[in-house]
Amino acid sequence: MINKTLLGLSLGALMFTAGSAVAADYKIDKEGQHAFIEFRIKHLGYSWLYGSFNDFDGSFTFDDKNPAADKVNVVINTNSVDTNHAERDKHLRGKSFLNVAKFPQATFESTEVKKNGDGYSVIGNLTLNGVTKPVTLESKLTGQGNDPWGGYRAGFEANGNIKLKDFNITTDLGPASQEVELILSVEGVQVK
């Protein structure tokens, strides 16, 4: 009888421990301005021009003990590009750049997540301007824990670089402006 009880307790403890290490799904919290997708590019090599995409949605799966189980999916409405300059934004939405009339969305879907020191390398496919290319985002967990509303949250920062010509954006902006740095800060609410 004691052996059956010990076996039952051991199996129960094992199941509880295994369950707590399972990857959790999160919805990116953009409603409360807790997530940002920004970019910067050199302006003629003299200064940085910053912008953002204000309309996007996404989710991620996170297991800090098993990064191979992690996933990231983001959909960006490219019409929401915002550089704090209406005329430039109109130009960026046009055929020479984002061509939002033909390609209203950009997407990122991870294919692999690897632990990299105290952060993660998130490798995936970015589709922009009708072209899909592999991109690596270097990411760090900024924090995780319970929120005051009974939920659980996890936040990350990530950045990576893309070459404009890789995505059929061939407008000549000069030699110092061939790459765009992507800068992401996201907070996700665990899906129950």
Swiss-Prot record:
Family: Belongs to the UPF0312 family. Type 1 subfamily.
Keyword rRNA-binding: no
Protein name: UPF0312 protein YPO2315/YP_2102
Localization (cell): Periplasm
Pfam families assigned: YceI (PF04264)
UniProt keyword annotations, A-Z: Periplasm, Signal
Record SMART domains: YceI
Superkingdom per UniProt: Bacteria
InterPro entries the record matches: Lipid/polyisoprenoid-bd_YceI, TTHA0802/YceI-like_sf, UPF0312/YceI
Organism annotation: Yersinia pestis
Keyword Signal tagged: yes
